[in-house]
Structure formats: C-alpha cells, structure tokens
Amino acid sequence: MVNLVIVSHSARLGEGVGELARQMLMNDGCKLAIAAGIDDPASPIGTDPIKVMEAIESVADADHILVMMDIGSALLSAETALDLLDPAIAAKVRLCAAPLVEGTLAATVSAAAGAGIDKVIEDAMNALEAKRVQLGLPSQPQHASLTAAPVDDRDARSVSVVIQNHNGLHVRPASKLVAALAGFNADLVLEKGGKCVTPDSLNQIALLQVRRNDTLRLLARGPDADAALAAFQALAAENFGEPTEAAPARRPASADRVEGKVVLYPQPQDRISRETSAAIGQQQLRLKRAIDRTLEDLSALTTLAEATFSADIAAIFSGHHTLLDDPDLYAAACDIIRDEQCSAAWAWQQVLSDLSQQYRHLDDAYLQARYIDIEDILHRTLRHLNERNEALPQFSAPSILVADDIFPSTVLQLNAEQVKGICLQAGSELSHGAIIARQAGIAMLCQQSDALTLQDGENVILDIPGKRVIRG
C-alpha cells in the first residue's frame, strides 16, 4: 500500500489538489494527507517542515509514503521533515519530482489500484504525457525504473532461454509466465533483442512478439531474484505448459464438405459515442465493477471449456482473464475518464480498441490474430457496463453460421450437432475461435469476401479444401 502527502506553498492549492485526487479514490487503497501553507495570516504562503512531518506521520500505516511537492522550499521542507521523523517511518518515504497536480492525480489512481511504489512514481512522472499528445508535442522519454532500458548484467542476475513453442510466446503461455513470476520480491525485466518489458503485463509480453527459436532473457535483482530465475527456467523447460510441436488439427468427420442452411449472425456493434461526465469517481467505479463481472464470466468460461474440451482450450479463457486483470489497462482508462471527463464505456473502448489495433499491426500472423480476443473482452465488458443481455441465435440442424467475424467465447458456446460450419467474411484460421471450432468438429472458412451476401435460410456447402462457398 502507498499513501500520499501533498506539500504546497498555498493552503488553497494543496486542498484543491487533494480534492481532485480524492475523486480518483474508489476504495481505501490509498490515503491522502496535506501539508500546505503556513500559520501566518499576514503571510500565509510558504511551507512548514513540522506540518510535513505530521502529515507523513498521519498516513504512516502504509508500506510507503510518496511526497508530492510544488516548488522551491517545498522540497527543502520535505527533506527537513525526513530528518525529524522516526527513522522507521522515514525509511518508508520517497520524494517525487513529478508535477504537483497531474503527478498527484496519476499517483493516486496507481496507488489506489494497488501498484507498488516504483510503479506509482513511474505513473506520476509520466503524467504529462497525455497533455503533450493532446497539444501535438513530441513524446518525452518514458520515466521508468527497471524497464526504461536493458539492465546491465553487472546490476542483475539473468537467465536466457530459447523458446521452443511452435507458435512462440503467445497469449496462453505468456499468461502462465505472468502467473509464475507474480509474487516474487524482486525487480524483474524480460528482454528480447534489446527490447525490455516487465513480466507483470500480459499485453507487454505479447507485444514483444517472441517467436519460436527466439532468445528470451529474464533479468532479476532483489531478495527473491534467484527463486524467480529458477521458476522462469523451470517453466521454459516445460515449454510454458505447451507441447513443442503443434497438435495435429482435429477436423470434423465430413471436413471436406459440410452442408447446411445459413443463419446470419450480425457482429455485435459496440461503437460508443463520446459522452461527457463530470462524475469521475462514479465512472471509474462503474468500470471497475464491469471488469470484475467480466473476470467472473471468464472464470466460468474457463471451467466450461475444460469440461467440454480440454485444458488447452480452457487456457484460452484463463489467458483472457490474465489479460483483462492487468492494472495498466484499468489505470489507462481511469486517466482518460479523469482527463477527458467522459463515460467509462467510451474510455474503456479507447484503451482496448487501441490495444486491438496494436495486435492487428504486428507482423507475426499468429499474434496478429489475437485482436479478436481483445474485442471479445471489450464487448463483454461493455455489455456489463450497459447492463445488456445477449443471446445466441436459435439454430436448427444442420446450420452454417455466417458472420463478419466471431468471438472465441461465441464459438465455445456453439452446439456442433446443430452448427456444422462457420463462414466468415473476415477472421483468421489462426484465431482462437478457429482452434475451438476444430476441437468441436465444426468446419470454418475465413476471408470469404461474399459471405455477407448469403441469405438467411439459404442452403450452402462449405468446400473446405477449396476454401469456397457453393450456393444452392
């Protein structure tokens, strides 16, 4: 837990920043204290080391206390306060150079979400980036702790492994890596080809595009460094829970030709218009609750997938769970809600649509196909935000489901006795939906440009080897 102290020359400014920051709080995950101005009615502008010391002591029931300051003597007063404090409390205190207003707001969101002190400081130091982008200014180098650049071997121990997974370190094995390295008391960095990310973010790992035969290095420093490296090495030896070779595709018995009546399945439309909302805390709370309900859905889908198919299929949805349970996503949406005073739905759409586009633009076809997983998660969260129920169409055997694209969670819920095939105008044979369809014994054709010209109830044949649809 990280608590914050706001130090300002002006009592009004300090209270105002505190008022803004409290709008970010949805729980008791972060306490705020204010030490602003001096007790001199004739000359109230200034800072008082005793006030700073007392403010720090009032929130000292945390692992760390981060002190945010405005200018000049605020820093001197904070440093003097450290000398006055009990050494045990002073050891918890960090002074932050971030801008007072933007930095305090970003730090509050990060601390309230449960981030550690280094991440809270990093977010505070990067707080001006959104404003720079909006003003068309070039981005500044990101302030980060261990992730800013490759860690010197002299500063950390490391282990390198060669990835043997057939499809590289995609979402499912990456989620196992996140889980395996969570909880170690160590600073950890994953490095591939000079690019570094922290292993607590599934999205960052996926965007590294770690392919088969790539070398991946984990660097660690801290009390649990050796244990973390051993866990990484052990997981790599097990190929991150996957076979080294791709499992043979399981096809339906009549895979070469499947016939049925068309059932058009319109892709759910989730485009959210921007809505203004000054209730920042309320919108952030709505989003948190929708994410929590979506995480519950994904746990249920994981259980269903394991009961219906296999642990491999279940790992798709446990991977979705890990991907969604990334505090950086929620923090980014909270920043948008705060900075743009918009609805939770619009902010969440911006964050996940941007992530989906990042996947679409990867040059690894297997990872590129994961864009639909992000959109599946986005759709499910927006359903909860808007309190909207949704049901699959009614199918009568034999049917051919026709759509622009299809979510993995939709394919999971199809009955293979009724749905004999899926025909998509877009889609990918490498998608998780296609993997589930193969295990279910449902034929699938993707990239059929004329798919949406088919009519409901029309009889069609899917020619799988020829990758074409035969009408009539």
Swiss-Prot record:
The keyword Transferase applies. It catalyses: dihydroxyacetone + phosphoenolpyruvate = dihydroxyacetone phosphate + pyruvate. One of its GO terms (biological process) is phosphoenolpyruvate-dependent sugar phosphotransferase system. Its EC number is 2.7.1.121. InterPro entries: DhaM, DhaM_N, HPr-like, HPr-like_sf, PEP-util_enz_mobile_dom, Phosphohistidine_dom_sf, PTS_EIIA_man-typ, PTS_EIIA_man-typ_sf. Residues 1-135 form the PTS EIIA type-4 domain. PROSITE patterns: PTS_EIIA_TYPE_4, PTS_HPR_DOM, PTS_HPR_HIS. PANTHER family: PEP-DEPENDENT DIHYDROXYACETONE KINASE, PHOSPHORYL DONOR SUBUNIT DHAM (PTHR38594:SF1). Consists of three domains. The N-terminal dimerization domain has the same fold as the IIA domain of the mannose transporter of the bacterial phosphoenolpyruvate:sugar phosphotransferase system (PTS). The middle domain is similar to HPr and the C-terminus is similar to the N-terminal domain of enzyme I (EI) of the PTS. The IIA domain of DhaM (via phospho-His-9), instead of ATP, is the phosphoryl donor to dihydroxyacetone (Dha). The phosphoryl flow likely involves HPr ('His-15') -> DhaM (His-432 -> His-170 -> His-9) -> DhaL-ADP -> Dha. Component of the dihydroxyacetone kinase complex, which is responsible for the phosphoenolpyruvate (PEP)-dependent phosphorylation of dihydroxyacetone. DhaM serves as the phosphoryl donor. Is phosphorylated by phosphoenolpyruvate in an EI- and HPr-dependent reaction, and a phosphorelay system on histidine residues finally leads to phosphoryl transfer to DhaL and dihydroxyacetone. Homodimer. The dihydroxyacetone kinase complex is composed of a homodimer of DhaM, a homodimer of DhaK and the subunit DhaL. Belongs to the PEP-utilizing enzyme family. This is PEP-dependent dihydroxyacetone kinase, phosphoryl donor subunit DhaM. It comes from Klebsiella michiganensis (strain ATCC 8724 / DSM 4798 / JCM 20051 / NBRC 3318 / NRRL B-199 / KCTC 1686 / BUCSAV 143 / CCM 1901).
